């Protein structure tokens, strides 16, 4: 059983909404490119910006033609059929130009894709035709990038392995960063287990503008009967002194003194940002890697939910602090469903 503290609405109402990507088609029945920029923190209104970019689009394969070997093969452009949708995160860089220049440079990219496997299924991106607006990101684009397939492709099983695949960019998600930089809690700190401690987790409730059931993301009904989605992130631990039991009221007062502000960004699709504007203990600060602003990309927290809602309207409708006993150190984490060194199963 856990105790819950509900944050007041003003802590997330200012920047807790993301507008949807408009899906409009032109005369050729193709989606019209669009760039969506959202601000996190207090970025400058003009001039140089730090932008985190996520390219959204479709995986396509060449259509099979019946007139192979004819002269028209050399004169007519190759037509493609869509085999899936996905994204390409290219990270943060300092950008000087306009949004429309950036959009055109992104849609002009020639991106080839390969589906492969390591410990899990992966998507390999190889990029050509990098225009001038994208030069700040060119170091990553030229090297090629590999991502977990379940994080960047809605249905990786639909990508053929025996055909050429291209990734056609249609939409660009940008997060303009101000004083708040992108800082993630290191995994070693997020997995930290301390005796006699209380784990502070955040339960984030969202409302989206699309129906998610058919894509495998089941909503829950709130007290008013509205469909909502939710996910949890770990913020840190409140350490109790030996022999002393901290009350729920004490934990709530510690959280209230932090004066947390929440917002949504577009890093990796949808991202949840936490900013500390109040007082923070040294113990808690060390668990946040000495940062007063941290980012939780939904791509890492709940990849499938992120894939389903990253183009939709998203709004924070509630944030709760959940106080739970910290998981004991002697509990073992099993990342694999196959138990090692049991019977005939041996670790290689």
Curated annotation (Swiss-Prot):
Q: Does the keyword rRNA processing apply?
A: no
Q: Which residues carry this modification: Phosphoserine?
A: 70
Key words of the record: Host cell membrane, Host cytoplasm, Host membrane, Host-virus interaction, Membrane, Phosphoprotein, Viral budding, Viral budding via the host ESCRT complexes, Viral matrix protein, Viral release from host cell, Virion
One of the protein's GO biological processes: viral budding via host ESCRT complex
Q: How does it sit in the membrane?
A: Peripheral membrane protein
Taxonomically, the superkingdom here is Viruses
Does this entry carry the keyword Membrane?
Answer: yes
Q: How is it modified after translation?
A: A large portion is phosphorylated in the cytoplasm, but not in virion. However, this phosphorylation is not essential for virus replication.
This chain's function reads:
Acts as a negative regulator for transcription and replication by sticking to the nucleocapsid. This effect might be regulated by the cytoplasmic interaction with tubulin that dissociates the M protein from the nucleocapsid. Plays a crucial role in virion assembly and budding. Forms a shell at the inner face of the plasma membrane and concentrates the HN and F glycoproteins.
Which family, according to UniProt? Belongs to the morbillivirus/respirovirus/rubulavirus M protein family.
Q: What is this protein called?
A: Matrix protein
């Amino acid at each position: 059983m856990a105790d819950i503290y509900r944050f007041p609405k003003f802590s997330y109402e200012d920047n807790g909404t993301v507008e949807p990507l408009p899906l409009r088609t032109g005369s050729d029945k193709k989606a019209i490119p669009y760039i969506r920029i959202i601000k996190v923190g207090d970025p400058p209104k003009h001039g140089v910006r730090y932008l985190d970019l996520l390219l959204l689009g479709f995986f396509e394969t060449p259509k099979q033609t019946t007139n192979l070997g004819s002269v028209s093969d050399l004169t007519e452009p190759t037509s493609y059929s869509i085999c899936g949708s996905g994204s390409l995160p290219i990270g943060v860089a300092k950008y000087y130009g306009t949004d429309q220049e950036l959009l055109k440079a992104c849609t002009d990219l020639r991106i080839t894709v390969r589906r492969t496997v390591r410990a899990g299924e992966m998507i390999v991106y190889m990029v050509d035709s990098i225009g001038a607006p994208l030069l700040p990101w060119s170091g990553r684009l030229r090297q090629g990038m590999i991502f977990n397939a379940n994080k960047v492709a809605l249905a990786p099983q639909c990508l053929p392995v025996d055909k050429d695949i291209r990734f056609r960019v249609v939409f660009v998600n940008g997060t303009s960063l101000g004083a708040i930089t992108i800082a993630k809690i290191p995994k070693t700190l997020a997995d930290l287990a301390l005796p006699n401690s209380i784990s502070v987790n955040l339960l984030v409730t969202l409302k989206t503008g699309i129906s998610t059931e058919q894509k495998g993301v089941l909503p829950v009904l709130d007290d008013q009967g509205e469909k909502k989605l939710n996910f949890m992130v770990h913020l840190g631990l409140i350490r109790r002194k030996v022999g002393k039991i901290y009350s729920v009221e004490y934990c709530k007062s510690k959280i209230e003194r932090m004066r947390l502000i929440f917002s949504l960004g577009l890093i990796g699709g949808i991202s949840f940002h936490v900013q500390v504007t109040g007082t923070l203990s040294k113990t808690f600060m060390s668990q946040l890697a000495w940062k007063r602003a941290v980012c939780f990309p939904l791509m890492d927290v709940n990849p499938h939910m992120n894939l389903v809602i990253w183009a939709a309207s998203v709004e924070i409708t509630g944030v709760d602090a959940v106080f739970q006993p910290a998981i004991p150190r002697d509990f073992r984490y099993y990342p694999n469903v196959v138990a090692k060194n049991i019977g005939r199963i041996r670790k290689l």
